[in-house]
Design a protein with these regions (language model features):
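Aromatic-anchored helix/helix-loop segment that forms the rim or "lid"
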Residues: 31-46, 80-104, 162
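Carbohydrate-interacting/catalytic domains
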Residues: 100-101, 113-120, 124-232
């Protein structure tokens, strides 16, 4: 009711956050399995119920001052430490941090590639950790930022500005099953395709493709096209 003309023009898209983190972790908030098809269903529910302008301009987010840090959620244990004192002292192990950073990079790509307005909570791009408030509101780690993660966020922001299809392109689902997700953003002859694999094993996806070329805009490489199909 808030988006039908007499209340607000847009909302903080917490349902996107819930679905995105569940997909990246492979489990929902109630610990049941959660795959790409569940993420697609959640997003289609939003698309069906929101006016089109609201869906394509929603304030998409992964973290806020009211939520635990995404790196802690994506790299930490399924069950948080029991006491507030334990949560305040908690830090990811080196192995868990590597796992969490890999997921955060995927989360950032999903945030910047999906329809809506990508919003980053300060410090998430620098690799800050922390459970709930006030543990998630630490000072910015000046001089101790995760430079690789920062560069990843900056690159995604640059691509978003350079590619109109990522700003306002139509959403088209290409694949959504288990850990594998692929969708395209299309606008006036330009197509941007995002592909994700949250599993632990490499996988190959065969997607329909109509352009004569396919550039990997993140790495500068190319993907093979054979008989009108893109292999990633």
């Amino acid at each position: 009711k808030y988006l039908l003309g007499s209340e607000t023009h847009g909302l903080m898209n917490y349902p996107f956050r819930t679905a995105a983190l569940s997909y990246l972790l492979g489990r929902s908030e109630d610990a049941s399995p959660y795959g790409a098809e569940d993420f697609r269903e959640a997003m289609e529910t939003i698309r069906e119920n929101y006016p089109r302008p609201a869906f394509y301009s929603a304030m998409n987010l992964l973290g806020t001052h009211d939520t635990p840090r995404i790196l802690t959620l994506l790299g930490g244990p399924e069950t948080p430490p029991a006491t507030r004192r334990e949560r305040a002292a908690f830090r990811l192990s080196p192995e868990a941090r590597v796992r969490g950073l890999r997921r955060v990079r995927m989360a950032a790509l999903l945030l910047y590639a999906f329809p809506g307005s990508p919003t980053v909570f300060y410090g998430d791009e620098a690799g800050m950790e922390g459970w709930e408030d006030p543990m998630n509101r630490g000072t910015f780690p000046w001089g101790r930022e995760d430079r690789e993660l920062q560069a990843h966020f900056l690159r995604l922001g640059t691509l978003r500005r350079q590619r109109p299809s990522l700003q306002s392109g139509e959403l088209r689902w290409l694949y959504a099953e288990g850990p594998l997700l692929a969708f395209a953003r299309e606008l006036e002859g330009e197509t941007s395709t995002a592909v994700f694999n949250t599993g632990t094993s490499p996988a190959c996806l065969e997607l329909p493709w109509y352009a004569p070329f396919s550039d990997d805009v993140l790495t500068g490489g190319k993907f093979p096209i054979i008989d009108g199909k893109l292999f990633v």
